[in-house]
Amino acid sequence: MLPSFTRKPADHPIGYLVALSGLLMQLMSYGIDNSYSIFSEDMHNDPSLGFPSITAISLGNSVSLGLSPAFGVLAGFCVDRLPPRFMMALSTILLFTGLWISSTLAANIYVVTFTYCLFASIGTACMLSPGAAATSSWFNRYQGLAMGINFAGGGIGSAIIPPLAGKWVVAYGWRKAFQLMSIFCAIGVLATALSARRREPKRDDSSADDETREGNKSGNGSLVRRSNEPATVGGEGAANNGHNEGKEDVREMGRKNGSHTNTSKVPPNGRGVGTNQQNGNDGEGLDVTEQSQRNNTFASAIDVDMDTSMDADEPQVIRSLHTHKLTPWELFLSMFTLPFMGNFLCWFIYSWAFYSLIYAAVPYISSMGKPGTVYAGVPPIPTDVAATLFTFYGVFQVVGSVLVGWLASLVTAEFAYVFCATVGGIGCGLLALGRSYVAFALLLCIIGFCMAGMFAVMPTLIATHLYGPNLGFYFGAVFLAGVVGGFVAPPMQATIQLRNNGSYAFVCVVMSVSMTLSALVCYATLWRSKRSGIVLAARKTKLVEIM
């Protein structure tokens, strides 16, 4: 976008175009990445690859999805310093190149792993953090809904690309199917053109003069404070003079009467410190000792406020991750704070369920009726038919991403995350009992809805707890937690399945436990008030019964 289009206020409609760009990038990237397991059977029987084992093929899934968060740390560091458009263009080029190199040059499965899968991993990292950071910069009130739109792309891609890939691999083989999938990289070109980070609108001189005149009319010579500036204490003396003079003026005013100075802190009862005139001169009727103690207390409060506000620029003041661009060492130390650890652990545990499902869904469903397995007596479900179940999964991912994102705007992101993780954990457990196409479709709808909701709310949790000039780094660092789940889960699940006579029951149990445990971590570390927005609004509302 041109600079004139990016200088807009928060929650501007143009922000939805930026959210749409993130949706399109995820449609392309996750739609292609999630199709990899569909080709496992064809690769396993391909003599040009040397008939690789299922475990060796699953390593490609680990690299493409599991290593992506590791590269996401570097991408998150870069997105704070480079335009998101540059990162998205790089993502599109890498994915397109990987598809064509692997489909034309691969002589064994490891060439596929370290060309297509590795390029796809880096490409996914280059689009995820930039898209989320760019979208979050445009929204304040509707950030949950915007993030829901941004992260709905994975569901749309899963609904469109894997079913087509399933038909192509049956008709043409995995090599030709890879080349046909590269057509979807054109979507990344459009998404790159739409992405941009919001910048604050320029303030012309006339508007600044009008604001100054309004401030002078507000009383006591104090200027109206802008919403993005720190609160100041005192009147003209505090605003115009140096540190020491400002402090002495305000302290002297406090010791004399404590009636005309506004402070930046207000007690819970809603009354300011110096509100004697507004409340009938509460100081009357007190003896000299009580009046002296009251004035001293007021002066002490002013001292605290002045020390906090006037000395904000001194070197000894603690630097905040919300207001300062942190050094690498400070970024490392901030990773041990509760907000970061809570987000990191939520994603770390959730990734086991997510990547296990992406890897195991189609092989599990297509194993129905397969000889030599525990499902030999079940009516068979062919691979191309099993791949169509991703349509149900993808459609409900879209619904879940948008609906849960909207729900998070009404209540809290923590409530939405805990709810989706709990229901999704139950659905993953029931998946072990599925034996028919209809049962799998119903369960994948529920799981897709919940996983997409968690995926959409996660960036909102990160932006809420770790907002500031380092947000891009924190996006990448939190998503780094997915390395363990994404890299380890597919091979581990393949090994467990082979050692249990082809049974995927333990795979479903691992997914269920991961989802449920993720809900517990969010509840314990991130959900501070333990109340939803609707409950808080209901408690503040006083209903009067009219007889």
From Swiss-Prot:
<feature type="transmembrane region" description="Helical">
    <location>
        <begin position="145"/>
        <end position="165"/>
    </location>
</feature>
<feature type="glycosylation site" description="N-linked (GlcNAc...) asparagine">
    <location>
        <position position="501"/>
    </location>
</feature>
<feature type="region of interest" description="Disordered">
    <location>
        <begin position="198"/>
        <end position="293"/>
    </location>
</feature>
<feature type="topological domain" description="Cytoplasmic">
    <location>
        <begin position="459"/>
        <end position="470"/>
    </location>
</feature>
<feature type="transmembrane region" description="Helical">
    <location>
        <begin position="345"/>
        <end position="365"/>
    </location>
</feature>
<feature type="transmembrane region" description="Helical">
    <location>
        <begin position="176"/>
        <end position="196"/>
    </location>
</feature>
<dbReference type="GO" id="GO:0010608">
    <property type="term" value="P:post-transcriptional regulation of gene expression"/>
</dbReference>
<dbReference type="GO" id="GO:0005886">
    <property type="term" value="C:plasma membrane"/>
</dbReference>
<keyword id="KW-0812">Transmembrane</keyword>
<feature type="topological domain" description="Extracellular">
    <location>
        <begin position="492"/>
        <end position="505"/>
    </location>
</feature>
<feature type="topological domain" description="Cytoplasmic">
    <location>
        <begin position="130"/>
        <end position="144"/>
    </location>
</feature>
<keyword id="KW-1003">Cell membrane</keyword>
<feature type="transmembrane region" description="Helical">
    <location>
        <begin position="387"/>
        <end position="407"/>
    </location>
</feature>
<keyword id="KW-0813">Transport</keyword>
<comment type="similarity">
    <text>Belongs to the major facilitator superfamily. RibJ family.</text>
</comment>
<keyword id="KW-0472">Membrane</keyword>
<dbReference type="InterPro" id="IPR011701">
    <property type="entry name" value="MFS"/>
</dbReference>
<feature type="transmembrane region" description="Helical">
    <location>
        <begin position="471"/>
        <end position="491"/>
    </location>
</feature>
<feature type="transmembrane region" description="Helical">
    <location>
        <begin position="506"/>
        <end position="526"/>
    </location>
</feature>
<keyword id="KW-1133">Transmembrane helix</keyword>
<feature type="topological domain" description="Cytoplasmic">
    <location>
        <begin position="1"/>
        <end position="11"/>
    </location>
</feature>
<dbReference type="GO" id="GO:0032217">
    <property type="term" value="F:riboflavin transmembrane transporter activity"/>
</dbReference>
<protein>
    <recommendedName>
        <fullName>Riboflavin transporter RibJ</fullName>
    </recommendedName>
</protein>
<feature type="transmembrane region" description="Helical">
    <location>
        <begin position="413"/>
        <end position="433"/>
    </location>
</feature>
<keyword id="KW-0325">Glycoprotein</keyword>
<feature type="transmembrane region" description="Helical">
    <location>
        <begin position="86"/>
        <end position="106"/>
    </location>
</feature>
<feature type="topological domain" description="Extracellular">
    <location>
        <begin position="166"/>
        <end position="175"/>
    </location>
</feature>
<feature type="topological domain" description="Cytoplasmic">
    <location>
        <begin position="80"/>
        <end position="85"/>
    </location>
</feature>
<feature type="topological domain" description="Cytoplasmic">
    <location>
        <begin position="408"/>
        <end position="412"/>
    </location>
</feature>
<feature type="topological domain" description="Cytoplasmic">
    <location>
        <begin position="527"/>
        <end position="547"/>
    </location>
</feature>
<feature type="transmembrane region" description="Helical">
    <location>
        <begin position="438"/>
        <end position="458"/>
    </location>
</feature>
<dbReference type="GO" id="GO:0032218">
    <property type="term" value="P:riboflavin transport"/>
</dbReference>
<feature type="transmembrane region" description="Helical">
    <location>
        <begin position="12"/>
        <end position="32"/>
    </location>
</feature>
<feature type="topological domain" description="Extracellular">
    <location>
        <begin position="107"/>
        <end position="108"/>
    </location>
</feature>
<feature type="transmembrane region" description="Helical">
    <location>
        <begin position="59"/>
        <end position="79"/>
    </location>
</feature>
<feature type="topological domain" description="Cytoplasmic">
    <location>
        <begin position="197"/>
        <end position="344"/>
    </location>
</feature>
<comment type="function">
    <text>Transporter involved in riboflavin (vitamin B2) uptake. Also transports FMN and FAD.</text>
</comment>
<dbReference type="InterPro" id="IPR052983">
    <property type="entry name" value="MFS_Riboflavin_Transporter"/>
</dbReference>
<feature type="compositionally biased region" description="Basic and acidic residues">
    <location>
        <begin position="244"/>
        <end position="255"/>
    </location>
</feature>
<feature type="topological domain" description="Extracellular">
    <location>
        <begin position="366"/>
        <end position="386"/>
    </location>
</feature>
<feature type="topological domain" description="Extracellular">
    <location>
        <begin position="33"/>
        <end position="58"/>
    </location>
</feature>
<dbReference type="Pfam" id="PF07690">
    <property type="entry name" value="MFS_1"/>
</dbReference>
